[in-house]
């Protein structure tokens, strides 16, 4: 994270950061089946809160790394600002909060989270889905994804025949969907 913060600190462009939950949120979410909504498990509500706390902790670590490089951040917490209609459908994204951060010279930072959901009670809202909505609204010149692998692959990166796709275009994405 410190290396990423160092790289970002050298650029004067405005940008928004969306990060995933990684190992902070995924284990509990999986153990308590949060992706499938509310259920009768009495421990699930505690698991929801614990997952939310852990992804917020990861967010704080990232924001602290940016702060050390003199970058101001504005955290937008999805579980407090967004609601979903199923796992890939954000009811409304609070662009005015992102805009206010950008207007005041801050970097808006948001992340994958457990949100309240109109269809199943709760939902895992991934950072990728948030990113899609932000791209539709802001229409950035480019989006950069940082991940555990050295790029986007044509198939599962653990497959020995997988190949890195050097530049991802709409045509590449169509090919990957097939």
Stretches with model-predicted labels:
Residues 22-27, 81-84, 115-117, 150-154:
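Short, active-site-adjacent cap segments at secondary-structure transitions
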Residues 33-115:
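Ligand-binding beta-strand-loop-alpha-helix segment within the catalytic cores
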Residues 14-26, 73-77, 109-110, 144-148:
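Short beta-strand segments at enzyme active-site cores
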Residues 1-16:
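N-terminal glycine-/serine-/threonine-rich phosphate-binding loop
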Residues 30-33, 90, 123-124, 157-161:
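Short, glycine/charged-enriched secondary-structure capping and boundary segments
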Residues 3-7, 46-63, 121-124, 129-132, ...:
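Polyanion-binding loop/helix "lid" in catalytic or ligand-binding cores
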Residues 62, 89-154:
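Internal active-site segments that recognize and position negatively charged phosphoryl groups
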Residues 22-38:
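Glycine-rich loop at the start of a catalytic domain that most often binds anionic cofactors/ligands
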């Amino acid at each position: 994270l410190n290396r990423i913060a160092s790289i970002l600190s050298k650029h004067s462009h405005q940008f928004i950061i969306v990060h995933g939950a990684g190992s902070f949120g995924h284990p509990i979410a999986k153990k308590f089946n949060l992706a499938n909504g509310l259920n009768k498990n009495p421990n699930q509500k505690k698991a929801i809160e614990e997952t939310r706390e852990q992804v917020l902790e990861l967010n704080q670590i990232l924001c602290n790394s940016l702060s050390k490089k003199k970058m101001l951040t504005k955290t937008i917490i999805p579980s407090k600002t967004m609601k979903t209609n199923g796992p890939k459908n954000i009811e409304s994204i609070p662009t005015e909060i992102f805009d206010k951060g950008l207007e005041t010279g801050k970097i808006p930072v948001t992340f994958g989270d457990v949100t309240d959901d109109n269809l199943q009670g709760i939902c895992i809202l991934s950072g990728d889905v948030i990113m899609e909505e932000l791209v539709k609204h802001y229409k950035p010149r480019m989006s950069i994804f940082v991940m555990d692998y050295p790029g986007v692959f044509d198939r599962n990166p653990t497959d020995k025949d997988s190949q890195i796709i050097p530049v991802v275009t709409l045509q590449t994405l169509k090919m990957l969907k097939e």
